[in-house]
Curated annotation (Swiss-Prot):
Positions that bind Zn(2+) 2: H126, H181, H185, H201, H205
Iron-sulfur listed as a keyword: no
Task of the protein: Fatty acid 2-hydroxylase involved in the alpha-hydroxylation of the long-chain fatty acid (LCFA) palmitic acid. Probably involved in the resistance response to oxidative stress.
Induction or repression: Not induced by H(2)O(2) treatment.
Record lineage: Eukaryota, Viridiplantae, Streptophyta, Embryophyta, Tracheophyta
Effect of disrupting the coding gene: No visible phenotype under normal growth conditions.
Catalytic activity: an N-(1,2-saturated acyl)sphinganine + 2 Fe(II)-[cytochrome b5] + O2 + 2 H(+) = an N-[(2'R)-hydroxyacyl]sphinganine + 2 Fe(III)-[cytochrome b5] + H2O
One GO cellular component, as annotated: endoplasmic reticulum membrane
Entry keywords, A to Z: Endoplasmic reticulum, Fatty acid biosynthesis, Fatty acid metabolism, Lipid biosynthesis, Lipid metabolism, Membrane, Metal-binding, Oxidoreductase, Transmembrane, Transmembrane helix, Zinc
Residue runs in coiled coils: none
Identification of the protein by name: Dihydroceramide fatty acyl 2-hydroxylase FAH2
């Protein structure tokens, strides 16, 4: 007897439904629903609230933190040129983190109930509803939690003076990433660089999901061989 395929009811909260899709989950999330109005995730208004973040909350919350940690490095004797170089290193580090997380965590293949559920919350929802403007940037609460182990790791690997500046660079890179990501989905860029980035990223969403993992840059896609080719894109379209 063939098991009946599970059907997600889009009129009900989605999070605890998607796990039932099993092996069909990956196919389902890559059939996007393009609308500005996002779906409901939870029955609870409290948990629903925590999943929604306006884009401008990211620079408002995190840029002051960037300035604060850079001031720590300055107070410990680093010059502004030294801080600038370390921040540049931190930003470069972020671009590699951006690529690595997107490729190996956000696009991990899942099929069990809880793995599908967790993946949907992490990234699957963005591929299913790519224009949901309130679930495009990373929630500040989750970012704050992740910053704790990162801060401790940097203190182990770097000096007391350089660790804050590295964190500032990584955090600044993250802010630029989230703002850029939002703009690529909801902006209408005229400048050639951003027009290219928008086309590059939407190609990842709608044509070749296993290529083009960079958001702010295609650098690491070039380095690691995941740059989508023109011929491949044509075949998928």
């Amino acid at each position: 007897m063939v098991a009946e395929r599970y059907t997600v009811d889009l009129n009900k909260p989605l999070v605890f439904q998607v796990g039932h899709l099993g092996e069909e989950y990956q196919e389902w999330i890559h059939q996007p629903i393009v609308c500005v109005e996002g779906p409901r995730f939870f029955e609870s208004d409290f948990w629903e609230f925590l999943t929604r973040t306006v884009w401008w909350a990211i620079p408002t919350i995190w840029l002051p933190v960037v300035c604060y940690v850079l001031s720590i490095s300055a107070s410990k004797g680093l010059t502004f040129p030294q801080i600038g170089l370390i921040v540049a290193f931190g930003v470069l580090t972020w671009t590699l983190l951006e690529y690595t997380l997107h490729r190996f965590l956000f696009h991990i293949q899942t099929k069990s109930y809880w793995a599908n559920t967790a993946h949907y919350l992490l990234h699957g929802c963005h591929h299913k509803h790519p224009q949901d403007g309130l679930r495009l940037v990373f929630p500040p609460t989750a970012t704050a939690i992740l910053l704790v182990p990162l801060w401790k790791l940097l203190h182990l690997l770097a000096t007391p003076a350089t660790a804050p500046a590295i964190l500032g660079g990584i955090l600044f890179g993250y802010v630029m990433y989230d703002i850029t990501h939002y703009y690529l989905h909801h902006g209408q860029p005229k400048e050639p660089t951003f027009k290219h980035l928008k086309k590059y990223h939407l190609n990842h969403h709608f044509r070749i999901q296993d290529k083009g993992y960079g958001i702010t840059s295609s650098l690491w896609d070039k380095v690691f061989g995941t740059l989508p080719g023109i011929k491949a894109a044509a075949k998928k379209s």
